[in-house]
Amino acid sequence: RAFKEALPGVGHVFVFDTAFHQTLDRERYLYPLPLEYYTDYKIRKYGAHGTSHKYVSEQVIKELGNPKHSRIIVCHLGNGASLSAVLDGKCIDTSMGFTPLAGVMMGSRCGTIDPSIMPYLCKKLNKTPDEVLDIYNKKSGMLGISGISSDSRDIENALFNEGDERALLTGLLYSRIVSKYIGQYFVELGGLDAIAFTAGVGENAAYLRRLIIDDCSRALGVFLNEESNAIRSDENRLISHQFSKVDV
């Protein structure tokens, strides 16, 4: 409405961030709650970062030579982070859920954790559910574990220049959580042709990419070319080793 008032002669286009994830099957978007909660309140997985996942998966398909069949995992890793499993250009699963709080560990968001932690913290901290939810969203994730920052660059600096143990733990926990989703999506896709990293962390944090791929290497046969991984560039590039079974 504000833009229509400010720019009445300009066309307006709605781009829904969840649209790319509307191809999920019911068994992937439903939660194991009473089914009427879905029918009455529309509680289901919606996902996020859809525009990014769609664009990046399309670019990867081009890089693969436009095959008829493709199995791709897109890792959109920024301050907010999500993964998606893309089969033949269509999303079949994604890590964010009913809200963007779900899924992998993020800059200041905890991602998916045991739901029973909520009432426990309410009692221990004498806080309301909304106050604990604020902690989940704004004081957790990389920030909560490192005690330094929600920015991976600050954590990387503390790790390599100061040897900070919490910075090390943050990277290890982050990579382990992301690699779990990669393993899950490998199974759902029935194999894997490529893993794509995008967004601020995915494109720039070489050490986190290495930790993530190292976690997956034995199971998936995926390996990085260390020299290619270390290069910072705005261009799409292959950073996997020539003998890797999966392109990165």
Regions found by a protein language model. Give the residues of each.
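Internal helix-turn-beta structural module
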Residues: 168, 172-192, 202-248
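Adenine-nucleotide phosphate-binding core of ATP-dependent small-molecule kinases
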Residues: 134, 141-145, 152-188
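Short glycine-rich phosphate-binding loop at a beta-alpha junction
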Residues: 10-13, 189-200
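Conserved phosphate-binding loops in N-terminal lobes of ATP-dependent enzymes
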Residues: 1-14, 18
